[in-house]
Amino acid sequence: MTQPIEIRAAIEATEELAAAFARLIPQLSAAMPPDLAALREIVASPSNTVLLAYDLASGKIVGTLTLVVCRIPTAIRAWIEDVVVDAAARGRGVGEALTREGLRLAAERGAASVELTSRPAREAANRLYERLGFVRRATNVYRYSVTAADRPPA
C-alpha cells in the first residue's frame, strides 16, 4: 500500500531541510546542495516558494520543487525549478503532487504561464509534465556561466 504524501511550503530553513537537500540534490544534479545559509536566502525570497513532499508514515522529506514567480515587463511569469523525488519514493505520485501544487500556486499568484526545463534523459518526468499540460517550446535554452572574471573586484 502506498503511504500518503503531504505537500507543504517551507516556512523556514532548518537543519532538517538542509539534510533533505543534501540527500536529494545529488539525485538531480552534479551541483552542490545549498547549505543552511543559502537555504535561508532561498526560503526568505518573496519570489520563491520551496515545496516539500513529506512521507506521512516516516515524516521524512521525500521530494522538493522550487517555484519562482515574478513580474517581468510582459507578464507575471513562473518557473518550476529543481524538481527532485528521492529514488526510494519514485512511482508514488510525489512528483505529480509537487508539480500540481506548484501550478496551483502559480495560478493563484497571477502567472500567465509556467516554464520548466527537463533533461531528455528524465523520461518519466517528461511524460509527467506533458500529461499535466506542459508543451515543448520551439526555443533555444542558453546558459552563460558566470566566472570570477565577470564579477567586480571586491
Question: Which residue stretches match the model-derived regions?
Answer:
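Conserved active-site alpha-helix within GNAT-family acetyltransferase domains
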Residues: 96, 120-146
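Acetyl-CoA-dependent GNAT
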Residues: 3-76, 81, 86, 99-101, ...
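Residues at or immediately flanking beta-strands
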Residues: 6, 113-115, 141
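Conserved acetyl-CoA-binding loop-helix of GNAT-fold acetyltransferases
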Residues: 85, 91-104, 127-132
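Short helix-loop capping/hinge motifs at secondary-structure junctions, enriched
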Residues: 148-151
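Conserved GNAT acetyl-CoA-binding A-motif
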Residues: 99, 106-118
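Actinobacteria-biased recognition of intrinsically disordered, low-complexity terminal regions
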Residues: 1-2, 153-154
